[in-house]
Amino acid sequence: MDFPERVAGAISACDIALIKRPLELSTDGHRTTGSPNLLTRPKILPVSSFPPIRRALISVSDKSGLVDFAKGLVSLGVEIYSTGGTRKHLLDNGVTAHEVASYTGFPEVMDGRVKTLHPKIFGGILARRNREDDLASLRSHGILEFDLVVVNLYPFETTVQKPDTVLTEAIEQIDIGGPSLLRAAAKNHEFVSVASQPNQYATILAEMKTHGGTSDSLRLQLAFDCFGETARYDATIADYLCRTILSNETFNPRGDEPSHSGLASIAMPQSITIPMKLQSGLRYGENPHQSAALYRLPGNSKATLTDAKQLNGKELSYNNLLDLDNALSIVRCFAKPSAVVMKHNNPCGGASAHKLSFACRKALAGDPQSAFGGVLGFNAMVDLETAEELCQPGLFIEAIVAPDFSPEAISLLQTKPKWRENVRLMKTGPLGTQPIELCYRFISGGVLVQQSDNQPPTSLNWKTVTDVAVAEELWDDIAFGWEMVRHVKSNAIILARDAALVGVGAGQMSRVDSVELAIEKAADRSHGSILASDAFFPFADSIERASKAGIIAIIQPGGSRKDDEVIAACNAHRIPMIFTGQRHFKH
């Protein structure tokens, strides 16, 4: 006997031994040890590749398209069971629907918190139609099969987007039964169809009309969509609770004493799930060979780009969105009418004034050459005067974001400039302040997470460290410059005069090079300007250069080992300097 025959013989003998081996039972009759008895395996029944849908369970919050869908199901002989408001909606529109509570024998309780959480519901969803033992269990307990589950969830995301929503209101919009029903149906997608979104109704009906049931591929796709929906729903809840914790200044999960060192004291979450939903595809990413899309995050109650209404122009690009977002972050920091000009995600111009049109003019004058092809942001409604500033000859603008645009401004921007058909006009509504959020940066094998650097600036900890004091008339420019510099890529230096940027040095590897660049951009406007630096000066060379350029005040975090040398240089050149104690790196 050769090797294959010996192996076959051994396998055959093993099979016979397993079949003949009696079950080892405990005193109560349950099997305790031994191999499974092949003769006790459940009987597997044949099933159709298009399982028929005879009975549907429907319980939805979003009732759009539901009546037509339900009528289509009834016309195909489907029996409908439903709950509360959904059943009333169906009955009011002439669709017969059995009451779930009458079927289960258990009423809806606790203000509707418990409706469908019952074995007679979940058994009918989870039963495997090809298992004789599962079907026997249904029969013995009087459980009906549900072949289609139609559920969408309480509007938690919509609720928490309202600015006046409190935690107790949000909690009541956390759906419990809905996700459970969806997950049960999706798990048993081999036999059960699940509709978690109204846009799936037409596809389900079309297959039912053609085949009498749904295909394996459709049920798998519906299950995939369903698990994505429930995962995003739970992640949205976790995200909201995380935001709630971050916004509570007194919250200290570690229970230790509050930090007064300027260092972060809030513990980061142990795990994070980022809920995102596709909002739109983009033509490409930063470069034409990169695919890209815009995804929406939940829970935004303030003005955002994902909520903004586009009033004019071509579709937004990946780079447009980056510039618009930073522009929005900058202008919402100022109380006075303000404007900013963005280029490659850095401000090349920015200003505040008593009128928006003046702020716009000053912002464009910050770096007129770089402003060409830029993106503009405003914190007040763009009126006709401001629009006229934007229509100056030789200026080309990619996109503009603002809380609103007057009809006259829209009309002018759509008709006068050469770029009228292309400029994207984005209306956000009232801006408000930007909440502290978590920011994410993907690295190889992981994600860096930090709080956003948008805490309102405070001068309480500012300290004049030089012998010469700051002139009273300079404080507005100093505050303006300190707010602007944190939005510039490090190493960041800005020069400001009369509440306007006159020079920006961004992204240089050496701080003195950023100083040189800002002075070069400002030219003769550097005389009488203030200088703001996002981090300390490691050497006194930047002070020497600032003095030659006519800079009359400096604000910076401090903290260098050579602070004494830097302070001495400022004293020597009679330049007042403020230490803020807070760094604003941006990488």
Map each language-model feature to its residues.
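Short, low-complexity, charge-dense intrinsically disordered segments
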Residues: 9-14, 18-20, 26-36
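N-terminal glycine-/serine-/threonine-rich phosphate-binding loop
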Residues: 38-103
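Glycine-rich nucleotide/cofactor/substrate-binding loop typically near the N-terminus or early
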Residues: 85-156, 252-254, 258
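Active-site/ligand-binding-proximal alpha/beta "capping" segment
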Residues: 129-176, 183-185, 469-472
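Active-site loops and adjacent core secondary-structure elements that bind or stabilize anionic groups
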Residues: 199-453, 474-484, 488-492
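Glycine- and Gly-Pro-enriched alpha-helical subdomains that act as flexible
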Residues: 348-368, 500-543
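Cysteine/selenocysteine-centered motifs that mediate thiol-based redox chemistry or coordinate metal-sulfur cofactors
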Residues: 376-377, 383-387, 391-392, 524-563
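C-terminal binding/interaction regions
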Residues: 396-407, 545-585
